[in-house]
Amino acid sequence: MKDTLFNESLNKRFCFDEKVAHVFDDMLERSIPYYHEMLNLGAYFIAQNLKENIYPKSLPKPLIYDLGCSTGNFFIALNRQIQQEIELVGIDNSMPMLKKAQEKLKDFNNARFECMDFLEVEFKEASAFSLLFVLQFVRPMQREVLLKKIYNSLALNGVLLVGEKIMSEDRILDKQMIELYYLYKQNQGYSHNEIAFKREALENVLVPYSLKENVALLESVGFKHVEALFKWVNFTLLVARKT
């Protein structure tokens, strides 16, 4: 279904309700440059890690968490890349999103979804975690707490994927990057009003960090190896490995 949510001002803060869930896949594809390429790239690196048998030997099969899994797109990408048996756990606090995810993955028997606040979840030891365009919605004071929980729950040599919208620390460059991004959205069919109304709804809801700040945050919780797998202007995909 086409995203027309912001044809007029919502007069409220952005939230992941039923209206958003109905158009979310279209919103992602038209709002995040190279969205599917980043999903496939992230899935590839997790698959390569699993080929090296990097997962807890106490588990019968690798466990992968997707936090803020929304409509389950990353699990579809993972199932295309990974041939061995895996257990996928998607956690999101939006039931409308999870209903979409369950519908899309009904033919897969390796995925389950939980409607919870992932900040309150006690994770099992896992082979991989993903936070794809999610950390930017977590309150800044809680980001380090969440990442530390993830780090502590990762198996040795496990990986964390972090996809984020980012900002530049240089005011002029940041303005130019935002302008180019808005031009991208116009080319995807969004009007000036739709872009403005969505920006208004996301104010103080989506809080981006710079690339340097995101890397520093990951390093502060224990990750010694953090790499940018992909970057387009103000979007990036990072991989962090626990060693």
Swiss-Prot record:
InterPro entries: CmoA, Methyltransf_25, SAM-dependent_MTases_sf. S-adenosyl-L-methionine binds at residues 35, 68-70, 92-93, 199. This is Carboxy-S-adenosyl-L-methionine synthase. HAMAP family: Cx_SAM_synthase. Catalyzes the conversion of S-adenosyl-L-methionine (SAM) to carboxy-S-adenosyl-L-methionine (Cx-SAM). Keywords: S-adenosyl-L-methionine, Transferase. It catalyses: prephenate + S-adenosyl-L-methionine = carboxy-S-adenosyl-L-methionine + 3-phenylpyruvate + H2O. It comes from Helicobacter pylori (strain ATCC 700392 / 26695). Homodimer. One of its GO terms (biological process) is tRNA wobble uridine modification. One of its GO terms (molecular function) is S-adenosyl-L-methionine binding. Belongs to the class I-like SAM-binding methyltransferase superfamily. Cx-SAM synthase family. Disulfide bonds: none annotated. It is an enzyme of class 2 (transferase). Its EC number is 2.1.3.-.
